[in-house]
């Protein structure tokens, strides 16, 4: 079950590979995510020293959050990945010109996980072509529906 999707990632990138990663979250963040108060639209993932971090993900604190904790809505959040996955991602991003984007946030056995994608950027004409294909697909469905 998806909590939040990053539709902009599918519009701006060709997704080559998908990997599920854990997140290091604080208690108030988990409560806010369960209440679907999260936005992935402008977020991205980068490598720093020894781990990957999610930046730009906006998690809005609930009004009932603790008074002694000052919630930071856009703080960098560490991703939890296996060493083999880390090596694969580093190799692809450094050599082949790929980037890593968050695709969605979902529950897996009660834990909050993030699906990240190894992606290559789309050019403007690729975006136009994707939009034409989506429009044609919608039009086909409309025609099929009306001919029945």
Swiss-Prot record:
Record GO terms (molecular function): RNA binding
UniProt GO BP: trans-translation
Superkingdom to which the source organism belongs: Bacteria
Main location: cytoplasm
Compositionally biased residues, Basic and acidic residues: 127-142
Region (Disordered): 119-148
Keywords assigned: Cytoplasm, RNA-binding
Compartments where found: Cytoplasm
InterPro entries: SmpB, SsrA-bd_prot, SsrA-bd_prot_CS
One GO cellular component, as annotated: cytosol
PANTHER family reported for this sequence: SSRA-BINDING PROTEIN, TMRNA-BINDING COMPONENT OF TRANS-TRANSLATION TAGGING COMPLEX
Family stated for the protein in its record: Belongs to the SmpB family.
Stated role: Required for rescue of stalled ribosomes mediated by trans-translation. Binds to transfer-messenger RNA (tmRNA), required for stable association of tmRNA with ribosomes. tmRNA and SmpB together mimic tRNA shape, replacing the anticodon stem-loop with SmpB. tmRNA is encoded by the ssrA gene; the 2 termini fold to resemble tRNA(Ala) and it encodes a 'tag peptide', a short internal open reading frame. During trans-translation Ala-aminoacylated tmRNA acts like a tRNA, entering the A-site of stalled ribosomes, displacing the stalled mRNA.
Protein name stated in the entry: SsrA-binding protein
Species in which this protein is naturally found: Neisseria meningitidis serogroup B (strain ATCC BAA-335 / MC58)
């Amino acid at each position: 079950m998806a909590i939040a999707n990053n539709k902009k990632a599918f519009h701006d990138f060709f997704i080559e590979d998908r990997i599920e990663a854990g997140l290091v979250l604080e208690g108030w963040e988990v409560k806010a995510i369960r209440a679907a108060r999260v936005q992935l639209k402008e977020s991205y993932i980068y490598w720093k020293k020894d781990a990957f971090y999610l930046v730009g993900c906006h998690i809005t604190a609930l009004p009932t959050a603790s008074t002694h904790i000052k919630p930071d809505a856009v703080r960098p959040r560490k991703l939890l990945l296996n060493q083999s996955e880390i090596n694969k991602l580093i190799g692809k991003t450094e050599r082949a010109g790929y980037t890593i984007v968050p695709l969605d946030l979902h529950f897996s056995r009660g834990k909050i996980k993030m699906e990240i994608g190894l992606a290559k950027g789309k050019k403007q004409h690729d975006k136009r072509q994707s939009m034409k294909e989506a429009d044609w697909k919608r039009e086909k469905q409309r025609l099929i529906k009306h001919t029945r």
